[in-house]
């Protein structure tokens, strides 16, 4: 039996994703931006406009006329440029694969043109559509079969940092590129919903195959992380999963929130927009986040916190960011903590362990006892 990545066309989607094989996506940019796989590179056979022209031709005159039009649109220097891009990808990634939407004509043409230029490069049979279907089915299966455990705790408790120190945990916020709370927006935005789902499915596959005997540890999230929605199958599994609660003192949570939502967020905006514009975008980001929760805060509390935020921004412009701690502390004490305490109380019977970060790490380090506890809790 030949090893995976042996240069042959494949429909072994599991090993394709587990191995992290380089993927050359030959679909049009509009298709790629709607949804793609982690790390895939888009070097299309046709531009969006060319694809639209070929599609109209196919509807009016049939497949052969559409193929002929496609060859007329991508010929000469245009064809040479695209083939050169594929050649360079193949040279950089000899263990990779190319694909189109269905694994049909477009990827066959790309493969043929590459072969004519002296490069044999394999393709994924079934293409993007079959790979996407495989990931959806895998995610459904994992959510039904895996022993989930949720890491819970008050806002600002460093749960994401703790997850990173526990082998086999899956970081949903990293996949969604969002810090989870109302203030969790990142400067460079979030993936599309389909990109998020694909990345999540790949992460779950790798966790299950790399840590088969461990429970699947996720952070206790709501159904939305920013604008990325958790799949229904995962939400159902999370609604029944046992909880491990990390307990962190208020002042530690204030400091953690200050670093992440002020210092790190400002750095992100400045890297993206420059020093001055970056600060203004950062300030608007905080204002908008506060505005988004104004109804839940109530009119008076929203006004008070907004005034504290503006005062902190004014001092920050003068070089002193420390005053942000004041409104962060109030927001945690008066808004987030009561809300989360209420939510946690409703699920108190699902709590299987609670302690500080060191105790939680120790709890998960003893995987055999963790497994037993989780199993008992679900029976």
Swiss-Prot record:
This is tRNA 2-selenouridine synthase. Keywords: Selenium, Transferase. InterPro entries: Rhodanese-like_dom, Rhodanese-like_dom_sf, SelU. It comes from the Bacteria. Monomer. Residues 17-140 form the Rhodanese domain. One of its GO terms (molecular function) is transferase activity, transferring alkyl or aryl (other than methyl) groups. The gene is selU. The active site is at residue 100. Involved in the post-transcriptional modification of the uridine at the wobble position (U34) of tRNA(Lys), tRNA(Glu) and tRNA(Gln). Catalyzes the conversion of 2-thiouridine (S2U-RNA) to 2-selenouridine (Se2U-RNA). Acts in a two-step process involving geranylation of 2-thiouridine (S2U) to S-geranyl-2-thiouridine (geS2U) and subsequent selenation of the latter derivative to 2-selenouridine (Se2U) in the tRNA chain. One of its GO terms (biological process) is tRNA wobble uridine modification.
């Amino acid at each position: 039996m030949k090893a995976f990545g042996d240069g042959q066309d494949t429909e072994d989607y599991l090993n394709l994703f587990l191995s992290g094989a380089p993927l050359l996506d030959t679909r049009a940019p509009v298709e790629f931006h709607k949804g793609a796989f982690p790390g895939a590179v888009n070097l299309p056979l046709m531009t969006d406009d060319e694809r639209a022209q070929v599609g109209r031709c196919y509807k009016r005159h049939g497949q052969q006329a559409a193929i002929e039009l496609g060859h007329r649109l991508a010929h000469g220097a245009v064809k040479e440029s695209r083939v050169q891009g594929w050649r360079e990808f193949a040279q950089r990634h000899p263990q990779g694969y190319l694909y189109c939407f269905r694994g049909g004509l477009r990827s066959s043409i790309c493969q043929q043109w590459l072969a004519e230029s002296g490069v044999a490069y394999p393709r994924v049979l079934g293409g993007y559509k079959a790979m996407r279907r495989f990931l959806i089915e895998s995610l459904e299966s994992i959510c039904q079969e895996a022993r989930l455990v949720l890491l819970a705790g008050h806002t600002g408790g460093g749960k994401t940092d703790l997850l990173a120190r526990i082998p086999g945990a899956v970081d949903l916020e990293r996949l969604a590129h969002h810090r989870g709370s109302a203030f969790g927006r990142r400067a460079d935005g979030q993936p599309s919903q389909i990109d998020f789902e694909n990345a999540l499915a790949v992460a779950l596959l790798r966790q299950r195959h790399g840590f088969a005997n461990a429970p699947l540890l996720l952070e206790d999230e709501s159904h939305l992380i920013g604008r990325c929605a958790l799949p229904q199958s995962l939400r159902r599994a999370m609604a029944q999963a046992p909880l491990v609660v990390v307990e962190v003192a208020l002042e530690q949570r204030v400091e953690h929130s200050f670093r992440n939502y002020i210092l790190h967020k400002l750095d992100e905006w400045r890297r993206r927009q420059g020093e001055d514009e970056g600060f203004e975008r950062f300030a608007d980001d905080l204002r908008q986040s506060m505005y988004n929760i104004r109804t839940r805060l109530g009119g008076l509390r929203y006004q008070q916190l907004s005034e504290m935020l503006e005062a902190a921004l004014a001092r920050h412009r003068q070089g002193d960011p420390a005053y942000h701690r004041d409104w962060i502390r109030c927001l945690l004490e008066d808004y987030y903590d009561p809300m989360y305490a209420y939510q946690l109380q409703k699920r108190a019977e699902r709590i299987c362990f609670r302690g500080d970060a060191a105790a939680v790490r120790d709890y998960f380090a003893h995987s055999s006892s963790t497994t037993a506890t989780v199993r008992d809790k679900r029976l």
